[in-house]
Amino acid sequence: MSLALLCPGQGAQHPAMFDRVRDLAAARPVLDATSELLGRDVFAAATADDRFDNVQAQPLLCAASLAHWQGLREVLPTPTVIAGYSIGELAAHAIAGSIDAATCLALSAQRAHLMDAASPDDAGLQAVLGVDRIATQRLCDAHGAFIAIASGYDHFIVGGAWRSLHALAEDAQSHGAEIRPLPVHVPAHTPLLAGAVAPFAAALEAASLQAPRLPLLAGIDARPVRDRATMVHTLSAQLAQTIEWAQVMRQAFERGARVFLQLGPGNALARMIAPAYPCCEVRAVEEFHSLEGAAAWVHSALERLQ
């Protein structure tokens, strides 16, 4: 049995998101680079009210996943597969060796600025739970919205103008769906951000990239990324294309992953996977008091499943 590492997307930032790595020497280069990029101390940035703004959130999320990895890489077995949810896919590439941490952070900032520039005003994302994909697509078609992320059989993130999302929410709730607003202010992974795709592809082409050294699954099609060209395509195309997260998790399982560890803030990805794959062991780093506790759990989980 083998290990999958997951890097989260936006929404779970919180003031204590760097507490487990605050005094970790191995994480210091990542934290210092993030502070320099943001123009303020990374710990202060995590507590600030603007931590959900794209230009703050995306570097913070990459930094959190990479800092956790720096503290765990010497004590964990080599992952069988790595995947990232939205901006988490960029962090996943840094873990897989496609880019270094500094390049990852710089690209995250460029990504955020390009998404903001391409985004229409008064738009964003919300979660729709309790209806299947066909019903969700019908709701989107009826109200001018789009499926941004397919997280599970009846769990979707939809994007669009807020007016469209409010109308969709009322319609969906009348059919028994649950709606959860998200603190994301751009309609990521929808055609509304098509204007950001080519500029971000150009930024990726100009960066120092290489093929991943570890197996990594792309969010848009759940296929392994094996070369530089595919990396550029999948990371740029996802800005305006649906993330097929449920398919990514299915492929991770099919590739032998039975222990899943979410890096970074929160445990949203772990909570998605656990009920869908009850035969697997699934946790998030932030469910433990320390990185040592998370590493000990990984080793014990792998032993239990042998």
Predicted feature locations:
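Gly/Ala-rich beta-loop-alpha elbow adjacent to hydrolase catalytic centers
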Residues: 65, 80, 84-88, 92, ...
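Flexible, low-complexity segments
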Residues: 64-82, 239-306
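Helix-rich "cap/lid" substructures immediately adjacent to catalytic or cofactor-binding pockets
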Residues: 1-83, 158
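Conserved small-residue
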Residues: 7-9, 34, 65, 88, ...
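Alpha/beta catalytic cores of group-transfer enzymes, especially the acyltransferase/condensing modules
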Residues: 10-11, 95-239
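Short beta-strand
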Residues: 44-45, 84, 146-151
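Short glycine-aspartate micro-motif
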Residues: 4-5, 82-84, 104, 260-262
